[in-house]
Each structure stands twice: as structure tokens, then as C-alpha cells.
Amino acid sequence: MAVADPIARLVKELAKLPGIGEKTAQRLAFHILKAGPGYAGELAGAIAGVVRDVRLCSECQTLTDKDPCAVCADPRRDSRIICVVEGVPDLLAVERTHEFRGRYHVLHGALSPLDGIGPSELKIRELLLRLEREPAEEIVVATNPDVEGEATALYLTKLLKPLGVKVTRIAQGIPMGGDLEYADQVTLARALAGRREL
């Protein structure tokens, strides 16, 4: 039995979302239908609102509905320390720790020549312009510990060191609750190299 065209269209659009396959898209479509027109309207309104109201912060390039964003506008945040992250989810992860009191800069990706992502596709130019306007004392590079993240960290270091700014990299190592015997060699080596006195 074929589904009605509007349902098939909704399933097709939902399946375009990252991590959503056809079966999950189908379940979501039927959930939306079952929830009724009120829910569907609220969902459509929320999607339209995000597209209409969310933009990039002119300072840190995060997604926000206010410019500057809440972090950049907060006078209690230390503007001398900037944590550079690949994406907004990374910024949110750092914020959840409640340990970082500086500000952020979101690159919106990582260098990946094989995928056609070079420096001009990232928000690196905006970072350099920001540092011209308001010099920082330290840049914390918090890109992911993968090939693209490491390449991005190295590229940023080469750009930023000549500016006289201290460039640091987040530590990497064994996750809390992890077993040493299951750690890969690179992770274990970095954990040993990054050890600190107790």
C-alpha cells in the first residue's frame, strides 16, 4: 500500500535531516499526524522562527537571536581569553562544564581539503578581524581531536603565534570512567604527555 503524497513528501524531507533514515522519518511523520494540527502548526512555526530570527553573532559567530549574543554581551566574561570551537554544539558542550569564563569564536567547521573546506569556508577571517579590534591574551583551540580538527588547530597556531597571542590546545586523554586497557595508543600517549602534578 502506498502512502498519500503529502505523507511521502514529509517523509522525504525529514529523511534529509542528518541521522534520520527513511524508517525514522516515517515514524516522525506519523507522530506529527497523530499529534494533530495544533502540534504540526507549532512545529512549522518553530522551524520558520528559527530561519527568520536566528543569525550569527557579529563578535563570536555563534547562532543567536540577539546581537551580540548573551556570552559576548556579558560583562562578567573575560574577553582576554577566546575559546575557538568548530561548531555551536561544541560551544554548548564547553558551557555545560561551567569551567570556562572567557568568550568564544565559532569556526562553523574544520579544515578538510578532501571535502573542499579550506580557510575561506571557515570563520577564520572574522577571528583575525576580531583580534585586530580587541586583542586577546590567549586563544584556546578546542577543535575536535580528529585529522580535520588537528589540521585546523595547526593552521590557527601558525596564523596566531606571529600576533603575539598565547595559543593553547585543550588537553586530550582518557575519559572519566574509561579503562586504560581499551584506550587507543594515541589517546594514551597524549594522556601521558599531558599529565599534571597532583
UniProtKB/Swiss-Prot annotation:
Q: Where is the Toprim domain?
A: 80-175
Which terms under GO biological process does the entry name? Answer: DNA recombination; DNA repair
The UniProt entry, under InterPro entries, shows: DNA_Rcmb_RecR, Hlx-hairpin-Hlx_DNA-bd_motif, Rcmb_RecR, Rcmb_RecR_Znf, TOPRIM_dom, TOPRIM_RecR
Molecular function via GO: DNA binding; zinc ion binding
Span of zinc fingers (C4-type)? 57-72
Pfam families per record: RecR_C, RecR_HhH, RecR_ZnF, Toprim_4
Cross-referenced NCBIfam families: recR (TIGR00615)
UniProt record similarity statement: Belongs to the RecR family.
PANTHER family in the record, alphabetically?
A: RECOMBINATION PROTEIN RECR
Q: What is known about what this protein does?
A: May play a role in DNA repair. It seems to be involved in an RecBC-independent recombinational process of DNA repair. It may act with RecF and RecO.
Specify the protein name.
Recombination protein RecR
Which organism is this protein's natural source? Anaeromyxobacter sp. (strain Fw109-5)
Q: What is the lineage of its organism?
A: Bacteria, Pseudomonadati, Myxococcota, Myxococcia, Myxococcales
